[in-house]
Amino acid sequence: MTMDQGLNPKQFFLDDVVLQDTLCSMSNRVNKSVKTGYLFPKDHVPSANIIAVERRGGLSDIGKNTSN
């Protein structure tokens, strides 16, 4: 499985080792959440402690970078 349909690993630092399929399944939720102004609801915290920092821009660039 590649990361092509999800988050680009070259743009992110992760503080834990996370399976690629986990990131891919989260990518749509992250993209939608960026538009709504929050990452995860309180009762939907991901089991892995994930901190992603976009190198080139801000969180607003995630949707642009993954939808081309």
UniProtKB/Swiss-Prot annotation:
GO terms for molecular function: ribonucleoside-diphosphate reductase inhibitor activity. It comes from the Eukaryota. Transmembrane segments: none annotated. Induction: By replication arrest and DNA damage. Repressed by CYC8, RFX1 and TUP1. The keyword Ribosomal protein does not apply. It is found in: Cytoplasm; Nucleus. Keywords: Cytoplasm, DNA damage, DNA repair, Nucleus. The keyword Transmembrane helix does not apply. This is MEC1-mediated checkpoint protein HUG1. It comes from Saccharomyces cerevisiae (strain ATCC 204508 / S288c). Involved in the MEC1-mediated checkpoint response to DNA damage and replication arrest. GO terms for cellular component: cytoplasm; nucleus.
